[in-house]
A protein has these predicted regions:
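Glycine-rich phosphate-binding loops of nucleotide-dependent enzymes
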Residues: 2-243
């Protein structure tokens, strides 16, 4: 397999606290890779460093064979790297459909001046149908349930046909039925060619969905391997499972 994302010796300090400590791992193209670890282990900070929401103090991020020097979210988005957040981020005052149009790279002026292409509107409606949100297309996004906003955010990042999607706790705060729905959509997009890196606390979901699994502790990987091996690794049991 080919490395799509390479994180090399990534380091981030906040004052005297080292949140990410020479962190290195690889996400292979075509994989669903998990990044797990106890609370405070640095998972979301790694996501923020990789996607340009935080500057790194040291280290390198390589995406699709190119080093991302001073990565910026918009630049990475155009290159095919998208992400979601722990708390679903949508434009509550816009309609559900308009959220996807904006995600295609169109600003407010484009929408109001009818500059959005027919192709983008068609893709937006197709994604809303795929994610079970078509009946809410004209509803303000703020009216959706929290779980539906999670699905909307996921659909929005797919507008650009990304090569790699980083999902930050995609099932946090949603009901069991929606967890199954989210898993279905991850599998479907993966089957269509999208690579995923997922931070998730639902270990049952991680173990049946992801391989490999990267385990962080104190900002650094302590184990990378298939789910069955990770579950039995003494370092993981000590650091993550609290054994």
């Amino acid at each position: 397999m080919t490395a799509l994302l390479q994180v090399k010796d990534l380091t981030k300090r906040f004052g005297g606290v080292t949140a990410v400590d020479r962190c290195s791992f690889t996400v292979e193209a075509g994989s669903i890779t998990a990044l797990i670890g106890p609370n405070g282990s640095g998972k979301t900070t790694v996501f923020n460093l990789v996607t340009g929401y935080l500057p790194a103090d040291a280290g390198e991020v390589w995406f699709d064979g190119i080093e991302m020097r001073r990565p910026h979210p918009a630049k990475l988005y155009r290159k095919g790297l998208s992400r979601t957040f722990q708390q679903a981020r949508v434009f509550g005052e816009l309609s559900v459909l308009e959220n996807l149009v904006v995600a295609a790279g169109h600003g407010w002026r484009d929408m109001f001046c009818a500059r959005v292409s027919t192709g983008d509107r068609k893709r937006a409606r197709e994604l809303l149908s795929e994610f079970g949100l078509a009946q809410h297309a004209d509803l303000p996004a703020a009216k959706l349930s929290y779980g539906q906003r999670k699905l909307l955010e996921f659909a929005a990042v797919m507008m650009s046909r990304p090569k790699l999607v980083l999902l930050d706790e995609p099932t946090a705060g949603v009901n069991p039925v929606l967890i199954e729905t989210m898993e279905h959509h991850i599998r479907a997009r993966h089957a269509a060619g999208t690579t995923f890196l997922i931070v998730e606390h639902d270990m049952a979901l991680v173990m049946r969905l992801c391989s490999p699994v990267v385990v962080l502790d104190r900002g650094a990987p302590i184990m990378t391997g298939p789910p069955a091996e990770v579950q039995q690794d003494p370092l993981v049991l000590d650091a993550y499972l609290g054994a």
